[in-house]
């Protein structure tokens, strides 16, 4: 999960629909493609929740607040994200987990998940230390509702193996040459170069040793 910047202008065609009058199924394939173009500008080809890869056949337009419980958000641009189709996680899990308070979930286009969540070299995710009781609850519930642990832990662990070695190289150099901080620029470049990759948040947390 990572901070997303949503553009203000809704996708073409979305404004002509109204909840209570139109069904979500009425949105045409061309209009859905326009929604995806706008979602791609915001989040690229990565799931808004797990940060994993998405593609045709492995994604769906996700209503942050479910249509069944919040029908007035059906055509609200601020309520739409792109989610992967991985069974048992992300949007699929959220829509099957039962009732919960929508205000509990971290909404990545208005909040920075980095404030709440910490990814470890082992692939796990947990609430950050030092959170207020309310924010700790929100972090815990976001992990639970979206099932950001479980099977995703193993997937992230596999992605992180090489970056753990890179982090250890930087750490060894910093310890061996405490007066030489040239490695810092190299580390920052590595973080920038991986920012577009799947699970980039977990990679960044490992490279910058945030779990220590």
Language-model features: where?
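Conserved, surface-exposed functional patches that form binding/active-site neighborhoods
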Residues: 91-169
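C-terminal, charged low-complexity interaction regions
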Residues: 133-212
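Short, charged surface segments at domain edges that flank catalytic/cofactor-binding sites
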Residues: 2-46, 70-75
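Short, surface-exposed beta-edge/turn micro-motifs
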Residues: 45, 79-80, 114
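Histidine-centered nuclease catalytic patch
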Residues: 49-92, 98-100
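Alpha-helix initiation and capping sites
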Residues: 41, 74-78, 111, 133
């Amino acid at each position: 999960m990572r901070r997303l910047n949503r553009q203000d202008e809704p996708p073409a065609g979305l404004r002509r629909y109204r909840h209570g009058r139109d069904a979500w199924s009425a949105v045409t394939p061309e209009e859905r493609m326009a929604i995806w173009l706008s979602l791609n500008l915001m989040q690229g080809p990565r799931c808004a929740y797990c940060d994993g890869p998405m593609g045709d056949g492995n994604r769906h337009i996700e209503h942050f607040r479910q249509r069944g419980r919040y029908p007035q958000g059906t055509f609200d641009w601020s309520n739409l994200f792109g989610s992967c189709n991985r069974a048992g996680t992300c949007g699929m899990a959220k829509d099957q987990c039962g009732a919960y308070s929508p205000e509990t979930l971290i909404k990545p286009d208005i909040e920075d998940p980095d404030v709440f969540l910490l990814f470890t070299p082992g692939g796990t995710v947990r609430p950050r230390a030092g959170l207020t009781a309310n924010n700790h609850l929100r972090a815990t519930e976001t992990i639970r509702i979206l099932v950001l642990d479980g099977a995703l832990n193993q997937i992230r662990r596999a992605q992180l193996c090489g970056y753990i070695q890179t982090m250890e190289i930087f750490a060894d150099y910093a310890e061996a040459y405490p007066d030489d901080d040239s490695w810092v620029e190299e580390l920052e470049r590595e973080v920038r170069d991986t920012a577009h990759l799947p699970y980039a948040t977990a990679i960044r947390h490992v490279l910058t040793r945030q779990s220590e």
